[in-house]
Amino acid sequence: MKILTLKARIPVALFLILLSGSAAVAQAPSTGTPTAINTAFVKLFGAVGSFTAKVDTQVLDPYQKEVVRLLMDFATFEGKVRIEINLAQMQSKDLPPSKIAELKESGMERIISLFRPDKKVTYVVYPGIQSYQTLPLAKADNDAFEKGLKLEKTALGKETLDGHDCVKYKVVVKDTNGPVLQAVTWNAADLKDFPLQIEMKEKINTVRMHFTQLRFTKPDPQQFDVPAAYGLMK
C-alpha cells in the first residue's frame, strides 16, 4: 500500500466539504455526517426506496457562477446510499492538474461513500488502494433513522425539466425538535414523484443536484458493503 502524503489527502477533504454542502450540513449540523449524506437527505426521495442514477452536481456562488462541478454515480437500497465519484474528473479551480496527477499516483482519485444507517456508520472507500475509512454517524442521525422524520412540501409552481412535467416544491424535513433540512425540489409526476433536481443552500453558496439516467431498479446489495479484501486505513 502506498504511503499517502498530506498533499494527496487535500482533494479528498475537498470532496468531503462538497458533500457536506450537498446534504445541507450547514443547515443541520446535528444530523450531519462527515460525508453529509444523512437520513434527512434520504427523506427527500419520498416513497422511492431503491434506484440508480447519474447526478450532475454543481456548487454555485451567490452570483450563480459555478465553483465546483462533478458527476456522481448514485444508488439507494433500503435506506442505504452509495455515491461514487472520480476526483480526476471534477472541475474546480482548487484542483489544478498537478493535484490530479498526485491523486492518480496515490490511487485515491476514485472514492465511494457508503451511508449505512443500519450499522450507524459511513464508509469512505478507496478502490485504487483497496482501503477504507469508517466514520460513525452522529447520535442525532441515528435517532432520526430509528424514530423517523416528517417531510413537509409547499408547491412553488410548475416547470418542465428534461421533458418531464415537474412541480417545484419548497421542502422542509423535520424531527421532533423542528427543521433539520430545507431544500427546493423539482418532482416529476410521471417518475413516481421523484425529485429530478434538488437545490440546497450551503452558507452563501447553492448546491444543485440534477439526476439523470434514472432507473427504479434494486441495485446489487453487495455494492453497499466494503469488499472483504479491503483494509482499514490507519
Where are these regions (language model features)?
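An acidic-aromatic
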Residues: 71-144, 202-210
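A short, amphipathic edge element
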Residues: 32-36, 65-68, 144-155, 209
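Short, hydrophobic/aromatic-rich segments at coil-to-beta transitions
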Residues: 46-56, 78-83, 162-170, 192-198
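Gly/Pro-enriched, hydrophobic low-complexity segments
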Residues: 157, 162-230
